[in-house]
Amino acid sequence: MYSMMEHELKTAGPPHTLQHSPGMSPPGSGVGNAHHVSKTACPPGVDPMDKVKRPMNAFMVWSRGQRRKMAQENPKMHNSEISKRLGAEWKLLTDVEKRPFIDEAKRLRAVHMKEYPDYKYKPRRKTKALMKKDNPVGKYPLAAGNLLASAVAQGQGGSPRMDGYGWGHAGGYMGMQGDALGYPQQLHRYDLSALQYPAAQPYMNSASSYSQMSYSSSPQQPSPVMSMVKPEPLSHSPTGVPNHHRGAFQGDLRDMISMYIPGGDTSESSNQRAYPGVQQHYLGGTVPLTHI
């Protein structure tokens, strides 16, 4: 059994000696060979030229050392602010001071063209520009342009909802004028119903009686504005009193009058004779002085 295991280990040993660790390069391979391997390591569906960076220009060559120096002096400064300051300093340099950096940029460009002869600069699209193009105004119904367009369309053709509420082409003022013109006729009906009230009621005050007398005595037709205001005190009173209730009202009035008339043994005939005078005092808004 041990002999079989030793035989298997001997057969499996030589292939391991031929393999190399991933961190070490095989013998005879240089830097150029490693560079070739990195170029072919891209996935098959991706263009290897997309991973290649542009050659640095003169400003990038100069700012490479200046940026590091400024970042060490101002650790809390943002990178965008550093770029602004470096750009302002680069513009202040003279052509003589820029010359060595320009020559270095030309050399780097020549090396780049030699290493990547098929390279073409392809600027990447900005994500913000794509978002604006992918979201046109038509996708949002509440945009300002769509609201203006819908308002113009409703102004030309009219809206069925607004027409149903009386705000169409004619406007809502026509209905209001018609309602205002219909108020005088309703006031006539109130005047006729006011004539059916009994002559005196125990809960009637001088203000309501005065308003009824002014309505019934006015011969001319009131204006629409006055007709909209005056029917309000009449809306709180009943529209009419049946004839069989008049006797009850008169009996209650006699009982109330008999409390103030001296001599409680007077007959009903004397109360009836005193009733018209007291009724006149109540209608006039004055209190009878017979009990004094």
Curated annotation (Swiss-Prot):
Q: Where is this region: Disordered?
A: 1-35, 209-248
Q: Where is the composition biased (Basic and acidic residues)?
A: 1-10
Biological processes, Gene Ontology terms: brain development; chromatin remodeling; dorsal/ventral axis specification; dorsal/ventral pattern formation; epiboly involved in gastrulation with mouth forming second; negative regulation of transcription by RNA polymerase II; neuron differentiation; positive regulation of transcription by RNA polymerase II
Give the residues annotated as coiled coil: none
Where in the sequence is Phosphoserine found? S159
Give the CC-aspect GO terms.
nucleus; transcription regulator complex
Task: Tell me the SMART domains matching this sequence.
Answer: HMG
Gene3D superfamilies, from UniProt?
Answer: High mobility group box domain
Cellular localisation: Nucleus
Biased composition regions of type Low complexity, renumbered to the chain: 209-229
A Pfam cross-reference name: SOXp
Keywords for the protein's UniProt record, in alphabetical order? Activator, Developmental protein, DNA-binding, Nucleus, Phosphoprotein, Transcription, Transcription regulation
One GO MF term:
DNA-binding transcription activator activity, RNA polymerase II-specific
Which stretches hold the DNA-binding feature?
A: 52-120
List, alphabetically, the InterPro entries matched. HMG_box_dom, HMG_box_dom_sf, SOX_fam, SRY-related_HMG-box_TF-like
Supply the PANTHER family for this chain.
Answer: SOX TRANSCRIPTION FACTOR (PTHR10270), TRANSCRIPTION FACTOR SOX-19A-RELATED (PTHR10270:SF283)
What function does the entry list?
Transcriptional activator.
Q: What is this protein called?
A: Transcription factor Sox-19b
